Amino acid sequence: MIYYGTGSEKTTLTEEDLRNGLYTALDKIGRKKKVLVVPPDITRIHSRAGEITKLAYDYYKKNLTDILPALGTHVPMTDDETAKMFPGIPLNLFRVHNWRNEVVTLGIIGEDFISEITEGKIKYPWPAQVNRLIKNGGHDLVLSVGQVVPHEVTGMANYTKNILVGTGGSEGINKSHYIGAVYGMERLLGKADNPVRQLLNFAASKYLNDIPVVYVLTVIGRDESGKLVTRGLFIGDTSEVFMLASDLSLKVNFTVLEKPIRKAVVYLDPDEFKSTWLGNKSIYRTRMAMADNGELIVIAPGLKEFGEDREID
């Protein structure tokens, strides 16, 4: 069901618009006694998820008991980073996703299905994994909040990825990323339907049905002055809400050029990009526009590590 949806290439949603849209949806969903919010981490600080999480906290008050940022294998946020992205929310509500030790396997997707969606290139089973708080926390509502934007692994970010990858375990994360790599980034970037998304949506249909997840999806673009603005807000619990957000993202987050780029300079926001693991997005998101033998210059003042984890690093 779609509880709320608005947006276009010219829409500019204010914080008041976000509040009205979110509260319209939450009113339709009905009263809840124990709510979990799953937003992104600070690597998605521009998603408006911080503000939306605060609005949800204001709406549910003491009934919002837990906030679990979808870290994936990213390094946990510091208290300062949490306060910056989620101002006005008590720090004691935040939980840290431990992708090594705090995941449960909901079920296994068989190797035949993986082989089918990957054109026979990969044949291994895939575990549908989530943080145990999602499965065993006893929440009567899980709000999955985040931005739909072109993504180098899943074609379009968010929706079922936020739960099954963002709160998943190492095996599920690594194997899903490898499927995207084998299929080919150029074939899936910006496409809502692709093998990785088929896997995540199929797993969700089999193993998330007993978990009351509602997705709150934003689409962010730039106005004529280059300022980031919110172009869309879509809230619901079916794939249709994701497709609406993806269609809008395709219009506002892609720039089609008349000819390839000979030389490009990419600046990485130091608050968002601190590792080469994330900084490599400067390559992923330009490579399809770069000319053969072109030059890409990456300015990364916040860079301090390779991996998003001390052991991986």
Located regions from the model:
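Short glycine-rich or small-residue beta-strand-to-loop segments that form or flank ligand, phosphate
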Residues: 34-45, 68-72, 144, 265-267
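Glycine-rich phosphate/diphosphate-binding loops that line cofactor/substrate pockets in enzymes
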Residues: 20-36, 61, 135-138, 209, ...
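Histidine-anchored nucleotide/phosphate-binding helix
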Residues: 44-63, 279-290, 297
